C-alpha cells in the first residue's frame, strides 16, 4: 500500500486583520504592525497545518512502521523553513536517533540546483512545492523533474495578466519502480 498525502499549506500572504487592510488586491496595509500581525497569523496557520500532517504521518507509521508514504504539494515554504522541516522530522532537528525510520526525504535533492525551483517571484526562483518520501520508498525511486520551463514571475505585474492563465507553480514529477 502507498499512502499519498497532498498538502496546500497557507501562503505567506498576511492573513486579514480587520481594519488594517486598505487594499487587499494590492496588499496595502494601514499600519506596519497590522501587516506584522497578519504575517504572524499566516505563519502560525501554515505551521499548524504542517503539524497536523506530521501527526498523520506518525499515526500511519505507528500502525505500520514499514508504511510507504509520499507527502506532496504546495508547502508555501522552502526546504530550510520550519513547516518543511517539521513534516520531514529530521534527526538533526529532533536530536533523537530512534526516530530515524520516521524521517521523510525530499526528492528534490536529486535535481540540479539551477533547476530546483517551482515558483518564481520578483526574479527569484523558490522551491516551495515538495515531494517528501519515507526512506523505504527511496529503493524504488528512479528520478524526478520540475517542469518550470514556462514559469512566469508571479509579481503583481503578472498576477492579473490574462495572457498568463497557467499556474504560478511548476509541477514536481517523480518516477518510482515497484516491479
Feature-to-residue mapping (PLM):
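Structured beta-strand-rich core segments of catalytic domains in phosphoester-bond hydrolases
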Residues: 1-14
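Context-gated lysine
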Residues: 10-12, 26, 45, 163
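Short, solvent-exposed loop/turn elements at domain surfaces
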Residues: 13-16, 140-141
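A solvent-exposed, charged loop/short amphipathic helix patch at secondary-structure junctions
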Residues: 15-43
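A long, amphipathic alpha-helix that forms part
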Residues: 36-65
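Metal-dependent phosphoester-hydrolase catalytic domains
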Residues: 55-70, 75-179
Amino acid at each position: 500500500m502507498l499512502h499519498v498525502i497532498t498538502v496546500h499549506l497557507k501562503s505567506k500572504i498576511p492573513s486579514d486583520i480587520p481594519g488594517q487592510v486598505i487594499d487587499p488586491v494590492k496588499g496595502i496595509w494601514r499600519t506596519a504592525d497590522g501587516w506584522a500581525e497578519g504575517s504572524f497569523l499566516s505563519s502560525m496557520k501554515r505551521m499548524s497545518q504542517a503539524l497536523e500532517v506530521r501527526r498523520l504521518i506518525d499515526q500511519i507509521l505507528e500502525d505500520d512502521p514499514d508504511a510507504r508514504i509520499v507527502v506532496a504539494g504546495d508547502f508555501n515554504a522552502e526546504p530550510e523553513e520550519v513547516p518543511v522541516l517539521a513534516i520531514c522530522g529530521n534527526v538533526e532537528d529532533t536530536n533523537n536517533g530512534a526516530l530515524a525510520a520516521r524521517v521523510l526525504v525530499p526528492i528534490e535533492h536529486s535535481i540540479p540546483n539551477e533547476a530546483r525551483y517551482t515558483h518564481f517571484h520578483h526574479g527569484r526562483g523558490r522551491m516551495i512545492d515538495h515531494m517528501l518520501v519515507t526512506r523505504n520508498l527511496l529503493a524504488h525511486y528512479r528520478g524526478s523533474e520540475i517542469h518550470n520551463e514556462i514559469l512566469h514571475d508571479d509579481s503583481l505585474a503578472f498576477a492579473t495578466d490574462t495572457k498568463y492563465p497557467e499556474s504560478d507553480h511548476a509541477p514536481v514529477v517523480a518516477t518510482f519502480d515497484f516491479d
